[in-house]
């Protein structure tokens, strides 16, 4: 077992409880079960999609258009600090998990990337951000407030054109959030860039305990890459297109079976959790 898998096994381990305690646990879980049913409604999915796809985490929310990748995705890992072999494997597993969900290949490359993921030290984050993201106010805010960070640019058609992710391996591991950073930032640069406390259960909710994509996250990714939606759509156009996409996903079982399907080839399964 690798060091990271061993750490995860300890972090997420459970223990056997007497039957009485399980009954109490089930009662305590009943609100969560109701929430699980609630998130599968068209209304909840629509509003959740608007929260994460049509808003921006650090400003720039006016006249937002929907963005996603239309060109082939080429991901490069700059692995300058930490357990490089393990980190490379984590990125490979998570990127291919996302590729399977969105139905678009994500190639791991050494040149001409359009997504660059930088594994570095916290002390070097600002330097990397200045070189790869510029000195926009939103970048400075992310450096000040965030644990890890990502940004993206779009072309004139509002398609995703380039993205950069910076993860401070030392700091994120110390906080027990390394996997959270890899999972959330890679998922966000697929076209779901905003965090929201209104979206639950989800990795996009900073108050959630979820380190890995949930069934709700799976559906949001499926919506983002459904043919009914196109890069460049306005908010009103997205709202008009979502019922078509939701109907198709419901017919295919992608909503009712989301909690099971999100685990296929997932990082969570790779980690043995």
Question: Can you annotate each of these PLM segments?
Answer:
Residues 24-29:
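Charged, glycine-rich intrinsically disordered N-terminal tails and low-complexity linkers that flank
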Residues 36-72:
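N-terminal, post-cleavage mature segments of outer-membrane
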Residues 39-40, 53, 57-62, 136-176, ...:
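Metalloprotease/metallohydrolase-associated module, dominated by Zn2+-dependent proteases
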Residues 67-82, 163:
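Acidic/histidine-rich, surface-exposed loop or edge segments in extracytoplasmic proteins
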Residues 87-183, 188-189, 193-199:
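Metzincin-family zinc-dependent endopeptidase catalytic domain
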